[in-house]
Amino acid sequence: MRIITLVIIHCSATPQGVRLSFDDCRREHIRRGFSDIGYHFYITRNGEIHRGRRHSIGICYEGGLDIRGTPADTRTPAQRASLVALLRELKRIFPKILVVGHHDLNPMKECPCFNAVAEYGGLPKLK
């Protein structure tokens, strides 16, 4: 088994009130020249977790923009609960992972529109 040490959280940059399904996100990534969706997991607003790419661990939640299109933490309670459950499971499988946001690797990005390190830095202690 390969050793995973980093989990990157993304947002889809989808305004509140606009739906971007897993299939829509996949189609958009392929249209932009990717071979497949760019994420390992995609969490829709209802908290449903969809599996995407198999060769990396990037988690994307549907949202990240307010109704004006401004970057904002738009996670629903269902998305927050699903993200915690998913991160706990990934931590169980890959105990050495560090959870970061996309902007922690590229400061030019707002994504995921919240401070993932502050929120999930104590991953083993998540409640």
Segments predicted by a language model, with ranges:
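Basic/polar, cationic surfaces and motifs that engage anionic cell-wall
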Residues: 1-12, 45-54, 62-127
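Secreted/periplasmic proteins that engage bacterial cell-wall peptidoglycan
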Residues: 3-55
